[in-house]
């Protein structure tokens, strides 16, 4: 009986923590990438992503959008593939890039407030600026503050 009560209590505590975490995540400001510098400045000059040797559509012009949170310490958290266009195996490369990003707080972020944002990167993009922009535009995500 005691074990059962402890397990039930542990399960209830876990559920409460998950609900509290989800509620906290919903309160994080969502900022579009083009507005991010008011909140956080990227400090990386380069990254060294993990790139697969084989996979689907690795040689096609592709855009990848990865959502993530920038924590109060300037580190990225919870990178998640949001979109890969066309579908293929380059999404993990985008996650690998985001995991390496680091930030310092911007002028509008005196308390180092965490924000939710996303990163778009392209692979095998054409030289023509209009064609390149058309591919990258496919990975813009709705629901992020743009003003």
Regions found by a protein language model. Give the residues of each.
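Charge-biased low-complexity segments
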Residues: 2-5, 23-147
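Bacterial N-terminal signal peptides
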Residues: 10-19
């Amino acid at each position: 009986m005691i074990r059962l009560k402890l397990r039930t209590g542990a399960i209830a505590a876990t559920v409460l923590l998950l609900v509290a975490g989800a509620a906290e995540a919903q309160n994080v400001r969502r900022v579009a990438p083009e507005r991010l510098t008011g909140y956080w400045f990227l400090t990386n000059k380069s990254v060294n992503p993990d790139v697969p040797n084989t996979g689907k559509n690795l040689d096609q012009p592709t855009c990848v959008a990865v959502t993530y949170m920038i924590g109060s310490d300037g580190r990225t958290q919870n990178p998640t593939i949001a979109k890969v266009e066309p579908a293929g195996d380059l999404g993990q490369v985008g996650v690998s890039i985001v995991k390496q990003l680091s930030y310092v707080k911007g002028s509008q972020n005196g308390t180092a407030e965490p924000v939710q944002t996303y990163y778009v990167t392209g692979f095998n993009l054409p030289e023509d600026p209009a064609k390149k922009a058309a591919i990258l535009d496919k990975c813009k995500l709705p629901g992020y503050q743009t003003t």
